[in-house]
Amino acid sequence: MNPEVLRASLLAWYDDQARDLAWRVGPAGGRAGVRQDPYRVWLSEVMLQQTTVPHATPYFLKFTARWPTVTALAVEQDGEVMAAWAGLGYYARARNLLACARAVANDHGGVFPDTEAGLRGLPGLGPYTAAAVAAIAFDRPTNVVDGNVERVISRLFAVEAPLPDAKPELKRLAETLVRDERPGDWAQALMDLGATICKPKSPLCDRCPVAADCAALATGAPETYPRKTAKAVRPHRYGVAYVLTRGDQIALVRRPPKGLLGGMLALPTSDWRAGPFGDEEARASAPAHAAWRHVGEVEHGFTHFTLTLKLLRAEGAAEGVIWSPRRDLDGLPSVFLKAARAALNNLL
């Protein structure tokens, strides 16, 4: 492999085939002198953590329409941002987003630091996000390695060590390809190659601009890279969700500020535990005395466990809850929106 030939081939492909993304200034714009907006780059990178481009894009457009600058986002109420984030999942990202926006607004005059080290000093910015913003927004020669890049590098070099143990080696190998020339475009070219050509299960090797340099392709089985260890069985938890209505309103609660789905509006629930709840036990934990009916169950997958919620529904009053219109539930986290819709038989 000749690194300079590989870089030239991939950058030429990127110049012609770069994805058109809502937050991106493409190669043509860059050549015309259009600068990347650090706020948009940062926001997109946070949203894209554990989230696909098609799913994140409407949220990005909604956020930038409502909060066009980091300063505008910084002064917003926490609950408004958390509600706008609902459906993207991984809600700690939204809390970190606000903490970072406020640090930029209050401590940096509304201007993002323009170095990787400076960005690492902001709350909620890990090594990957800091490197990505530094490269894409400020053209700093940083080593930007996400899941797509790990896959590309593992195949280019036919790395035999399985993930996650291979991560340090993949990062080291990726670093050997970083140059001062076009570092932002280079980072995005690797990402685009992984997203559109070097796919996990069906790589389009016949369309790959760097196929001639791919050691995994030379083995005849590029789809077997990166190597992976067997996945552990994901634990299963159980709980009860209580759907209490009063006319056209539904009872909600705000979850504790720390922990899973912290600070979000939610249906009242029991604790979540390793075993299922019987009907009598489920009713005993209900938030109000009412004629509770078992109306079904929903299952939801979190990152580290699967949750099954038994659904109990009743009509009545309760103290210590927030009454919300049935038709205004889109701000709920996905698991509770799914539960509410199932319990109400989609008649919101």
Residue positions per predicted region:
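Intrinsically disordered, low-complexity, charged terminal extensions of DNA damage-control enzymes
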Residues: M1-G26, D192-L348
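Catalytic cores of DNA base-excision repair glycosylases
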Residues: N2, A8-S9, W13-E223, H236
